[in-house]
Amino acid sequence: MFFRFANRVGMPTDVAHMLLELLSGVVVGFTLGLIGGGGSILAVPLMVYVVGVPNAHVAIGTSAVSVAANALAGLGYHARARTVKWRCAGIFASCGILGALVGASAGKAVDGQKLLLCFAILMIGVGFLMLRGRHDQGCADAQCTRDNAPRVMAFGGLTGILSGFFGIGGGFLIVPGLIASTHMPILNAVGTSLVAVAAFGLSTAISYMLSGYVDWGMAALFIVGGTLGSYAGMRVSRRMAGASGALTIFFAGVIFCVATYMIWRSLRG
């Protein structure tokens, strides 16, 4: 097990690392609260390249714990704002949990550097998915019905597998999946996605925790920072609901930049 929090307290360099972890958590939480995704897809690069975690599997396991907790915080804010469609969330998350457990088992068997390279390639694909649906406003009355339930279940299972394999909450995949399968507005998809993000993250976190791939001290700091960031992100998302297209373009750009950097670092060795 990894308990770095207790071992580094009192050292100047450790204080700097703790601040980096706290601020990284704020970024993760803010992104989750803002668009329901992106927290985990940014958490792993932040842990590896900013905080300096040397083990990719530890970064993935720790990010899963942090993102799940931050997603729950963001979900509370969205639930109070009544932007969560609970039936859709339950169907999507229940199918995704099984996929996440399968994906996590497969991910731990892959070399860390190769895993990061595959992760970056997935990020690019997700960025294009976001850009593709940036102008769709959706239907405010959209619900999960007998007709679209199979699509919701299929998207949930596939997203869960990818979530577990890469240790991500899957929000960037869940939001497009919910919109594609139910045609709900992006603000509802953001709130609803956090149920699945939390469920996928917990499933992945448990799998990695049992293998000793969780740094609990770092996770605690990410959670504290993420809780603050989630609240701020949710407030901004409600104000910018009408400008979701511009917001989507911006975050897709961030994803492309981070993915390019990760590919360069992975190929550089």
Question: Predicted segments — roles?
Answer:
Residues 35-44, 167-177:
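Transmembrane helix boundary and interhelical junction motifs in multipass membrane proteins
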Residues 189-196, 246-252:
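Helix-helix packing/entry segments at the starts of transmembrane helices
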Residues 174-175, 195, 199:
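A general structural signal for well-ordered alpha-helical packing
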Residues 56-60, 186, 190, 194:
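Small-residue hotspots at the loop-to-helix junctions and early N-terminal turns
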Residues 63-67, 193-197, 218-223:
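Short hydrophobic/aromatic, small-residue-rich stretches within specific transmembrane helices
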Residues 1-31, 44-56, 76-162, 180, ...:
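Juxtamembrane transmembrane-helix boundary motif
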Residues 62-76:
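Transmembrane alpha-helices of multi-pass small-molecule transport proteins
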Residues 204-209:
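Membrane-helix boundary/interface segments in integral membrane proteins
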